Regions:
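Acidic/aromatic-lined carbohydrate-recognition and catalytic surfaces
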Residues: 2-151, 155-162, 166-169, 176, ...
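Glycoside hydrolase catalytic-domain groove-lining segments
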Residues: 230-259
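Carbohydrate-binding surface patches
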Residues: 348-391
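Solvent-exposed beta-hairpin/edge-strand motifs
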Residues: 387-405
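C-terminal beta-strand-rich structural cap/linker in extracellular carbohydrate-active enzymes
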Residues: 409-431
């Protein structure tokens, strides 16, 4: 097992356009480390095409002018290395987007290597698309690489490999692989194996937004260390999340997130209810082996991140500060093996439908845990049980390690009025 897989994956998404030039990122690294994050994921920093979208990369070896210090005479690559050094000084590892499903439609690559791209019947370079509510949505600023049928598969593969080696040389140690399921599994398998043969502890994470559970599993089998799961869209009730979790967990680990750069801000979705924001972070952190949150989540930001239009001027002044709470949740995650892995997990039915009872047991250690969560972020909800043995296998006493209002002793029979959105985190060890 790789070194990075021995502990929980805690990932802070520093969105480059909101953070501004690399020289200003230090304060965000300091805050991320203080909250207990080990990794910082940054979206693409390469030079974009005419659309200016972060994900429309025109030059994989150049840098986005919006992220460079205009007053500095330091070469761009050195500015990146200095930023990486700041992250490492804070005890953080850096992950970056790897975008090899497509590039910018105006990238020189479309002229220099026309054989690398999917073509329309009339010969034009194809743009990737998706279907939303039955409607075809085309990203006209993108050109789709033809990994499946190119006449020069080795040349295209070697180019992708050189991009990864370039980013590793800058100091990045992990890759969030954008639209991973749209790239052939055999390419991922070869790329990951070749990189890890030279850089053993490199971490690869598959972004699989919008694909089926089977596609997620098939992508995971290509050698990825983690995939992103769909817990963000769960309603705390339906069984599909556990089915998806169980389908993938034997293959690799997964990462939950309460919001991302692709979704609305959670604080906006819940109309500023911080009980709901805390509720979702606690669940996301403890449900799967990994957790990710984007910059600004800790302050209850409401304005969505945008891959073209976001700027440092969009930094919000709020009255919310969840940094201490997030640090406590991350400490719980790191402190118990059961939250480091894709543990066997079950949801127990309960007489009060507003209470979620999630059981987890480590497959590799003796840890066992219960999360008793008030689904209702507006009202108190009552939980009671004569004994906890109906929920856990261990006969050892339960300990309350909750991030807030932890109980010194767990009595039986047990009765507790959960505050709005509150979660009890109880742990024990099987004998």
């Amino acid at each position: 097992m790789m070194m990075h897989n021995r502990r929980a994956m805690t990932l802070y998404n520093l969105f480059p356009l909101l953070a501004g030039p690399f020289s200003r990122w230090g304060e965000h690294f300091t805050r991320a480390a203080a909250m207990g994050f080990d990794w910082v994921f940054v979206n693409p920093i390469q030079r974009p095409g005419a659309s200016r979208s972060l994900y429309s990369i025109a030059d994989y070896f150049g840098f986005n002018p919006a992220l460079l210090d205009p007053q500095s005479t330091t070469p761009p690559a050195e500015q990146v290395r200095q930023m990486v050094s700041q992250a490492r000084a804070s005890g953080l590892r850096l992950m970056i987007d790897l975008v090899i499903n497509h590039c910018a439609i105006d990238s020189p690559l479309t002229r220099e290597h026309p054989e690398w791209f999917v073509r329309e019947p009339d010969g034009r370079v194809s743009s990737p698309f998706c279907l939303e509510n039955g409607q075809k949505v085309v990203w006209h600023d993108l050109a789709q690489f033809d990994h499946h049928h190119t006449r020069d598969p080795e040349g295209l593969y070697r180019y992708c490999l050189s991009v990864v080696e370039h980013l590793l040389a800058l100091g990045f140690q992990g890759f969030r692989c954008d639209a991973a399921y749209q790239v052939p599994p055999n390419l991922w398998q070869r790329l990951i194996q070749e990189i890890k043969s030279r850089h053993l502890h490199t971490c690869f994470v598959a972004e699989t937004l919008g694909c089926s559970a089977d596609q997620t599993r098939d992508t995971a089998q290509s050698g990825f260390d983690y995939v992103f799961n769909s817990s963000k869209w769960w309603n705390f009730q339906d069984w599909w999340l556990i089915e998806q979790y169980n389908l993938v967990r034997e293959t690799t680990r997964s990462i939950s997130f309460p919001e991302s750069h692709d979704t609305p801000r959670l604080c906006q979705e819940v109309n500023g209810n911080l009980n709901a924001v805390k509720q979702w972070y606690l669940f996301s952190a403890l449900f799967s082996a990994g957790v990710m949150m984007p910059i600004g989540f800790e302050f209850g930001f409401r304005k969505p991140l945008h891959v073209v239009n976001t700027s440092p001027a969009d930094w919000e002044k709020t009255d919310a500060d969840l940094t201490s709470y997030i640090a406590k949740v991350n400490a719980i995650k790191k402190g118990h093996f059961v939250f480091h892995e894709e543990s066997p997990t079950n949801m127990f039915p309960y007489q009060n439908p507003n209470i979620l009872i999630m059981w987890k047991a480590s497959a590799k250690h003796r840890d066992e845990a219960l999360l008793i969560l008030n689904k209702d972020p507006q009202h108190h909800q009552e939980f009671s049980t004569d004994q906890f043995r109906r929920f856990v296998q261990s006969g050892a006493p339960l300990r309350d390690v909750s991030p807030e209002y932890a109980l010194e002793y767990i009595h039986e029979p047990f009765h507790y009025s959960l505050r709005p959105g509150q979660g009890l985190v109880l742990v024990t060890s099987r004998m």
